Amino acid sequence: MYGEWGMGNILMMFHVYLVQGFRSEHGPVKDFSFERSSRSMLERSEQQIRAASSLEELLQIAHSEDWKLWRCRLKLKSLASMDSRSASHRSTRFAATFYDTETLKVIDEEWQRTQCSPRETCVEVASELGKTTNTFFKPPCVNVFRCGGCCNEEGVMCMNTSTSYISKQLFEISVPLTSVPELVPVKIANHTGCKCLPTGPRHPYSIIRRSIQTPEEDECPHSKKLCPIDMLWDNTKCKCVLQDETPLPGTEDHSYLQEPTLCGPHMTFDEDRCECVCKAPCPGDLIQHPENCSCFECKESLESCCQKHKIFHPDTCSCEDRCPFHTRTCASRKPACGKHWRFPKETRAQGLYSQENP
């Protein structure tokens, strides 16, 4: 009996050992593969952000869900008031709280001014022409356009792609002085086109410089925490998690920022019109409330029908062309019929008379 019990324990321990060995052999491989793919994805995202050539492109990469809303906020200054609206009306998940539209416009303008492009600059004529030291010009420098500005990738430089030559009239002076200064035409290179071009052989992957982080700042292995669209980075778990599992950073006190809609329960954001619009339209004879999208009143009234030279019918909430035999007075104290509509001859004179005495 003891022999059978001992043999059973040995077999059980051997089974546990095999299971543990399998897990230790295959488990880390799976985790390492996931970590490697995550790191590769983060590096690709970082390269895309580094290569962004405009504010709109950067926002499209960093906030791909809301980049059209960002574009609208940049173009329409009136949408800046969305930040001060209530939580249930025209609130955004990212933009409304953390960024200001005017600040984004300033950043965009600064970005555009620093792009690689021909810029007016001052060059020394003698250095440009390679003249000897016994010859100089007055004025010594001229204004021309040369390529300058920043590129969006490492390993490239702003260089000219097309050049023209402009003529400048200058005084050429030679020493020792043997004659009066001579007026001569001088041709100087003027850059008309610029582009960011590589300065040497390019590596298959761009070199990404990283700063050293102290353990107190971040204990996670990745210095960049870019996640897929439907996920967010969790500093405590050191991984990307679904948005439902963790609040947005800095929005713990603003739960309305995590709402799935941008404009409230009754409205949706129209990307073409760059504004919130009601989800369901009202019937043709009703007016829609701009805030809560409720339907109320008639589109037509006594005054509106009068301006159209028609008759207002409250029972159908519409303006009709059919003119009755008696004159009705509009809110402007002008008759709706008698001048603009045809009716029986025997009542026309009465209608015309009623215009003077409604």
Curated annotation (Swiss-Prot):
Alphabetical list of Gene3D superfamilies matching this protein: Cystine-knot cytokines
Gene Ontology CC: extracellular region; extracellular space; membrane
Pfam assignment, any one: CXCXC
Induction conditions: By the transcription factor c-fos.
Listed SMART domains: PDGF
Sequence repeats by residue range: 227-242, 263-278, 282-298, 306-323
Annotated stretches, region: 4 X 16 AA repeats of C-X(10)-C-X-C-X(1,3)-C: 227-323
Function in brief: Growth factor active in angiogenesis, lymphangiogenesis and endothelial cell growth, stimulating their proliferation and migration and also has effects on the permeability of blood vessels. May function in the formation of the venous and lymphatic vascular systems during embryogenesis, and also in the maintenance of differentiated lymphatic endothelium in adults. Binds and activates VEGFR-3 (Flt4) receptor.
PANTHER family the record matches: VASCULAR ENDOTHELIAL GROWTH FACTOR, VASCULAR ENDOTHELIAL GROWTH FACTOR D
Protein name (database record): Vascular endothelial growth factor D
Source organism of this protein record: Mus musculus (Mouse)
Taxonomic placement: Eukaryota, Metazoa, Chordata, Craniata, Vertebrata
